């Protein structure tokens, strides 16, 4: 008889849907340990604008994979999968259940399905690409990527040389586009996963929550946090960190491209668009149990029952 795989829980949902509150409540009942699945919460010094769990929340339920990088650094889905698997295994060794909480669907997908191994970096080809960029400009190289891999070109900004260079490098090494390779599934997740998504039933309620949260972030000092980042000479608006929702709009304000009120409005609109994309992902997700943001008690009971029934089946 083969040994049963360990249990892991996914708690997904759009931004401002109440994931953190629900996860903390669950940890107070069961031996779960939280792992953040959020491409913005990884950055140090970006606390208010990302709605990062505060000190009290972190004391109640410490989150792994928060504050692990400086905003100058990039982080891929492959990096996340590596770090999340390591954290999940540590939690299981402690006799507890990994609870993965967040809204970065690409990270959840990479963790669940695995990633096709990409070719290793080739210094000679990378140098060749950098030389071409010096003579032609990155915009010309972006046009080249658009021809061979329009999907990646749509995701990668012309002023993001690190990711643009890597996409071209992968194609020149392997003869396959980054999109082709990343769509190929890799090693599956060695866990029994129960998957949940939380969201309000009505879109208007989610919009209300998003606007309220943005207002609270401004009251908490988001502008001051943004100014501290803006004064750093090593940060610019084409970095993945500064492209995070809210931060890009506030950067435009500090650059003098719009008023503060306009930046807030654009930030709220961008957050709504993000939430719409997250819900679109989730609607096509298999084996998903939906929870209601407006009924946290019932959502907590549903999660609790899932853990209890799993324990009973293992006896």
From Swiss-Prot:
The record marks 104, 126 as: Interaction with substrate tRNA. This is tRNA dimethylallyltransferase. Keywords: ATP-binding, Magnesium, Nucleotide-binding, Transferase, tRNA processing. ATP binds at residues 13-20. Disulfide bonds: none annotated. PANTHER family: TRNA DIMETHYLALLYLTRANSFERASE. Its cofactor is Mg(2+). Substrate binds at residues 15-20. Residues 38-41, 162-166, 243-248, 276-283 are annotated as: Interaction with substrate tRNA. GO terms for biological process: tRNA modification.
């Amino acid at each position: 008889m083969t040994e049963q795989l360990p249990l892991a829980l996914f708690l997904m949902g759009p931004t401002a849907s109440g994931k953190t509150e629900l996860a903390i409540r669950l940890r107070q009942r069961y031996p779960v340990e939280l792992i953040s699945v959020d491409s913005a919460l990884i950055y140090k010094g970006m606390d208010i604008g990302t709605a990062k769990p505060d000190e009290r929340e972190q004391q109640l339920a410490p989150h792994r994979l928060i504050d692990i990088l400086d905003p100058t650094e990039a982080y891929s889905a492959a990096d996340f999968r590596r770090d999340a698997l390591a954290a999940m295994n540590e939690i299981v060794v402690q006799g507890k259940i990994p609870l993965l909480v967040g809204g970065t669907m690409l990270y959840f997908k990479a963790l669940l399905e695995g990633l096709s191994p990409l070719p290793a970096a080739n210094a000679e080809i990378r140098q060749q690409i950098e030389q071409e960029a010096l003579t032609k400009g990155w915009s010309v190289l972006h046009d080249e990527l658009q021809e061979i891999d329009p999907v990646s070109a749509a995701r990668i900004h012309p002023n993001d040389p690190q990711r643009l260079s890597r996409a071209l490098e992968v194609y020149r090494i392997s003869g396959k586009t980054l999109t082709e390779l990343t769509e190929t599934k890799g090693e599956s997740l060695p866990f029994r996963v129960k998957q949940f998504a939380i969201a309000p039933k009505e879109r208007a309620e989610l919009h209300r929550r998003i606007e309220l949260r943005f207002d609270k972030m401004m009251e908490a000092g988001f502008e001051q946090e943004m100014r501290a980042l803006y004064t750093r000479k090593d940060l610019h608006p084409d970095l993945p960190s500064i492209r995070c929702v809210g931060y890009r709009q506030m950067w435009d304000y500090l650059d003098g491209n719009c008023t503060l009120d306009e930046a807030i409005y654009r930030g709220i609109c961008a957050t709504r668009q993000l939430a719409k994309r997250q819900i679109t992902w989730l609607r096509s997700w298999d084996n998903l149990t939906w929870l209601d943001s407006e009924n946290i008690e019932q959502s907590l009971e549903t999660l609790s029952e899932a853990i209890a029934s799993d324990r009973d089946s293992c006896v």
